[in-house]
Amino acid sequence: MQKKEDNIKRHEIKFVFSDKNENKLLKNYELKKIFPDRIVESIYFDTSEFKFFHLSEEGVTPRIKIRIRGYNNGLFENLEIKKTNSYDRQKIVIKKFNYNLTDFYKNLKSFGIDGVFTKKLKVKYKR
């Protein structure tokens, strides 16, 4: 397993539009795709009371988000932990993560996250 921290400060704005409009925008503004299209799959974890979801919806800090994620292959190879507080956001990515409950909880505990979390939401989309 390989740990990577992404603490780059950024603000993202996301738009949804059709393939036709995407091609038009790329052409009209002479934009280039940085990455080829890919399938992103994520499984989000939460408590039985959906604590992480409610904290996020209410904008409460500190809060965390836990997910496993994969790209193009149906495998969930990355464990991602996002911690947000009132002054900072931290994203920890553990690459080549082989999902099993023992390693999952061991990794969370190493970052000070303790509790019982279950799979709550699976998301799949083309990026």
Residue spans of the language-model regions?
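Phosphate-end processing signature that detects enzymes handling 5′-triphosphorylated RNA
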Residues: 1-127
